[in-house]
Amino acid sequence: MKIIAKIPAWMLLCLFILSPTTETIYTSGLPSLTRCFSIDGCITQMTSTLYFLGFAVGILSLGRLSDIYGRRPIVLLGLFIYIVSSIISIFSFNIEMLMIARFIQAFGVSVGSVIGQSMARDSYQGAELSYVYAILSPWLLFIPALGSYIGGYIIEYLSWHYVFIFFSLAGTILLALYYQILPETNYYIAFSQSSKYFEVFNIIIKDKMLWLYAFIIGAFNGIYYGFFIEAPFILIDQMRVLPSFYGKLAFLLSFASIFGGFLGGYLIKKRQVYDKKVMSIGFIFSLCGCILFAVDSFILEFILVSNVFAIAMIFMPMMIHMIGHSLLIAITLRYALEDYATVTGTAGSIFGAIYYVVIASVTYCVSKIHGETISNFSLLCLVLSISSVISFYYICLLYKKKSIIIN
């Protein structure tokens, strides 16, 4: 692959973090939105479902457009859409208008994920690409948690409208900056229009292993984002925790994720543990965390405990799960597309759209089972974790079958 320009790592970071940080800032204000529009919390939570569906549509379409017209113009277009939709959200007079605006916002911000990854592959190769991802990983885990912290303070001292004002300002700064210095990294613009997009699409649709990987990634990310859309109602509304303090609690999950990342690196590099075994360890952490979460949630439903103890009973199991999340997801993303090395960009956009639909489905389930306790959500987490383990077992069987055919 010919490299015509290199995008700096910090510019990649800004692209990568924009979507998850947008969502974690926003979810801190869900109880406030519910009171403002005088609606049920489950309806407010569905704005996140629309967000992830919009993200899936954006990944599928904007990723393809960047192959045809170049990375730079589509990134700028996506940021412009993000800004306009954030401004519309400020003036939303009902929840339906906000839902539409959130869908459009996610469509625009999806450039950060799909095109950010494409620009990284355009700019770096081999060990250099691995190094760039390695130095960005801690920040990718830390900054979204910082989003909850920022969102908590905005909600506590201002109102939910200022969350979207913040998004508008951040998007405007990025758009102005990227308009000046964002390089074009796609060398194959002239050749992309003849790429076999639909041929790849048809192959992926029939690939059982890819669908199983997509389910695992979608389920684990669904648990993560589902927690952020359910926890504010439990902690802020039911337990009367201040939004700013809730934002600080989100750092606990971030620290667990960072620990999981370092543990994965230690197991692979220092202990020479092969990838599939590290994934198995990740599933064990997740399953243990989700079982403990389910047990704790039912204890909290029937036994009155102090807020401090209740918070520990909610966050400790999720921290255990997040260690497993970090051990698992990066390796899963690597193996999912190993058979699509020559069409990584196209396959990646289709694969990303699939697992974001899974995330949207999980968040929809969270909204449908929303209640005054967290026990329903904890059971959903347990079901998703067990289902992911079963999916991984089936993947291992498919690998064995594949190796037998080759030999």
Swiss-Prot record:
One term under GO cellular component: plasma membrane
Pfam families named in the record: MFS_1
Keywords from the named record: Cell inner membrane, Cell membrane, Membrane, Transmembrane, Transmembrane helix, Transport
Tree of life domain: Bacteria
GO MF, one annotated term: xenobiotic transmembrane transporter activity
UniProt similarity note: Belongs to the major facilitator superfamily. Bcr/CmlA family.
Stated name of the protein: Uncharacterized transporter RP603
Native source species: Rickettsia prowazekii (strain Madrid E)
